[in-house]
Amino acid sequence: NALGMLTSGKVHLNISRDESAELFTKAKNVQINKFSGPHPAGNVGVQIHHIAPISSKDDIVWYLNAQNVADIGEYLSTGNYPNEKIIALGGSSILNPVYLKITKSASLEDILEDRLTLKDGIRIISGDVLSGETRLFNQGIRFYDESIAVIPESTEREFLGWALPGFSKYSLSRTFISALLSKKFTSFNTSMNGSHRAIISFGRWEDVLPMDILPEFLIKSILAKDIEEMEKLGIYECSEEDFSLCSFVCQSKTDVAGIISNGLQLAEQEG
């Protein structure tokens, strides 16, 4: 009801198809939408695309996560805005992945105390590992983030890595022997496993982007700074995090998500 007072539009509640909690499945005064599938099915941009696509720069959509809604409810009920939230702490440099209740202003040094496998040679990421932001020990988690990832910082390059069998390497295209072995957990680090090269169309971006968008043509229109073409190809429906998997799987080592971010900034500047 509180959210309905904040907007003249429809309030959508997006939940997992397997959700069983009646708090969500029987919520009133909202339109309930169910989603399933691997990442990025849970991204708000992907969900908006399938529920009510943004067709122009004049369309406005506000979104909140469950903890934000709970915070608003507590504020309206008690007059006090909560200063705590629950976050997920994970990554291969974390001793035991866990959920934590933290003070929103807590430093990462306090949060990570006695929880790291090592304190040097690591990258601390506020947000998810694909689209988060690198942080220092004396900084805190970003306001809207609900996770912290810590992974090893790669400082060495592997000579002729593409020619090695890759027993423990992840490969979307199944080009390493690891694809033939039994499934096991892969420990990721910050290595790009190669340098940037020309964009070659293999359809990898489309494989991991569950949106009715042509990512290759959109990226090229952004690089060409063609605003009109960007709008035709759906730039207003895009967000950086929705394309982070495209960056991860790109055989050309192209920062697809970064280009999308630049495209959105360019579209905003041009009005």
Model-flagged regions — what are they?
Residues 1-271:
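Buried, small/hydrophobic-residue-enriched core segments of structured protein domains
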